[in-house]
């Protein structure tokens, strides 16, 4: 399988402008993500997709291939599709790698790549939800699965409701999973999902992947044991360094 890894990187950010270029222990966040992605032996190529010349020039400084995309896209999926087309090459799958996880585990990328078997249309990662607080956090997206580990639904609410059990104990009575936001797309499916219009469920939950489910596409889910540590604000830098044991 030929698999392309794409790292979207935008300079504009409401909460953290210039985020991809911030310094983290001597390297930019973008370079750290890129270096981690390159450690995955299952990716054929890795490119950075950006709409900003400052990011493009920086990426070239550490010899990364860059695809310049237009500034406005409805979603990261659309940006990934444009970047894929700009390579001028054919790939079987495209994996969208979050550009704000400087210490992403290459094993997570491999885990996703391993289920890209030609039959899988779309794929993503999930991690067990083992606490009441995380389970009921509406910022955490939960996944409901069928017996083939394909997503039935993604929601900010808790699904299923467990009748007759105190909600503080629900996580002890059912295997709940939350979403870890990295996606793999079969190339032909990526083209199709970018043609879809926003759907009612997507608009209600503000979750793009519900558009795919509503239109009959299947999303395979693989369980990871490694949590993701995103940087969304300047304060997150210190938090992530402490979580990774890189700062006391």
Where are these regions (language model features)?
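N-terminal glycine-rich phosphate-binding loop and ensuing alpha1 helix
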Residues: 2-49
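Conserved core of the sugar-phosphate nucleotidyltransferase
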Residues: 104-196
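A residue-level structural signature of the nucleotidyltransferase/glycosyltransferase Rossmann-like core
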Residues: 4, 47, 101, 142, ...
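Conserved alpha/beta core of the MobA/IspD/sugar-nucleotide pyrophosphorylase nucleotidyltransferase superfamily
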Residues: 89, 170-248
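Short, high-confidence coil segments that cap the C-terminus of an alpha-helix
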Residues: 43, 89-91, 118-121, 217
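Hydrophobic/aromatic residues located in beta-strands of well-ordered beta-sheets
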Residues: 5, 46-48, 94, 123, ...
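Short phosphate-binding loop-to-helix
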Residues: 47, 53-111
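A conserved hydrophobic position in a structured secondary element of the catalytic/binding core
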Residues: 50-51, 104, 185, 232
């Amino acid at each position: 399988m030929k698999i392309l890894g794409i790292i979207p990187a935008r300079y504009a950010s409401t909460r953290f402008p210039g985020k991809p270029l911030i310094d983290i222990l001597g390297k930019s966040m973008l370079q750290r993500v890129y270096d981690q992605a390159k450690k995955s032996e299952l990716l054929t190529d890795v490119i950075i997709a950006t709409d900003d010349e400052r990011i493009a020039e920086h990426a070239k400084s550490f010899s990364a291939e860059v695809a310049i995309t237009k500034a406005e896209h409805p979603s990261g999926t659309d940006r990934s599709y444009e970047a894929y087309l700009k390579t001028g090459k054919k790939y079987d799958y495209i994996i969208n790698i979050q550009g704000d996880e400087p210490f992403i585990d290459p094993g997570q990328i491999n885990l996703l790549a391993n289920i890209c078997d030609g039959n899988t249309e779309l794929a993503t990662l999930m991690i067990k939800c083992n606490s009441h607080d995380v389970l009921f956090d509406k910022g955490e997206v939960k996944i409901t699965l069928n017996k083939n580990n394909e997503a039935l639904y993604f929601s900010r609410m808790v699904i299923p409701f467990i009748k007759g059990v105190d909600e503080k104990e629900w996580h002890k009575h059912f295997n709940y999973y939350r979403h870890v936001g990295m996606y793999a797309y079969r190339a032909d499916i990526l083209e199709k999902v970018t043609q879809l219009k926003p759907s009612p469920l997507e608009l209600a939950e503000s979750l793009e992947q519900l558009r795919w489910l509503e239109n009959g596409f299947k999303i395979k889910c693989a369980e990871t044991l490694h949590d993701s540590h995103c940087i969304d604000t300047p304060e997150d830098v210190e938090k992530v360094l402490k979580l990774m044991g890189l700062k006391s």
